[in-house]
Amino acid sequence: MAQLGGAANRAPTASLAPTSQSLRCAPQPRPSRADTGSLGRYWGKAAAAASREHPFPGTLMHSAAGSGRRRGALRELLGLQRAAPAGWLSEERAEELGGPSGPGSSRLCLEPREHAWILAAAEGRYEVLRELLEAEPELLLRGDPITGYSVLHWLAKHGRHEELILVHDFALRRGLRLDVSAPGSGGLTPLHLAALQGHDMVIKVLVGALGADATRRDHSGHRACHYLRPDAPWRLRELSGAEEWEMESGSGCTNLNNNSSGTTAWRAASAVGATAVETSRRVAASRTKAKDTAGSRVAQMHSLFRHLFPSFQDR
């Protein structure tokens, strides 16, 4: 009986030991379909959101930093720290190391001071420009990212010849290299804009005092002298880059500036003169035609009389 009891006690112990056959026959746990579907929908939505975040490379860098933080928060909520794509981890690691304005990054957004500088330059407010330059002198080299105009372009456009001299002297004192003939949108230099707006003193300051290059051409191949008004003096044309043969032949007087009131009046007078000449020519032609018609009728009558009356003599 003791042996039977011992055998009975050993039998359950042996049955509890796992065997290869029992492992194969045991049911394996299956992943929940609901979990798989939710994860699939999550990754699909995350990929769609990532594709919509940056439709083109010029998107501001603030959205990139915010998207990285949002992705990290989503993974923390869903417990997917280990299942994040490698691309997301690399982007967030780069943001942590360098940030949107770190070394080697292409920061495209404007700082508040840069934004204020561009607005003040476009409006020609020198007092605001001077305060900003005292705080950050490097703003002098900052141009408008849309038009490509520097502060010299805007001052020349507004006719601020004294402010041009002050800005140039400030650049010399601070050791900043300021290009007086730098091209902007369309290849226009500050000298081109001064000629377009009819600011004679600005032209004299740019060429005579600041050493602007009067031979620079815009993208249409025109120098600043081609945008002067028709009644501009010859000395001003010479400063604006007109050559001797242009001044002698009079071709330098050709004005391409549509904003000039003198050009508009000259074109209107030319149009009126051309209309008057055309009207006179038509009247003279009609009179000549009438005379020819009358002469032909008289000749026909004379020939008729000669046939009817042979004794009729042409007198």
UniProtKB/Swiss-Prot annotation:
UniProt cross-references to InterPro entries, sorted A to Z: Ankyrin_rpt (IPR002110), Ankyrin_rpt-contain_sf (IPR036770)
Keyword annotations: ANK repeat, Repeat
SMART domains assigned: ANK
Span list, region Disordered: 1-39
Tree of life domain: Eukaryota
ANK repeat intervals: 112-141, 147-162, 186-216
PANTHER family: ANKYRIN REPEAT DOMAIN-CONTAINING PROTEIN SOWAHD (PTHR14491:SF8), SOSONDOWAH, ISOFORM G (PTHR14491)
Entry's family note: Belongs to the SOWAH family.
Descriptive protein name: Ankyrin repeat domain-containing protein SOWAHD
Biological source species: Homo sapiens
Phylogenetic lineage: Eukaryota, Metazoa, Chordata, Craniata, Vertebrata
Gene behind the chain: SOWAHD
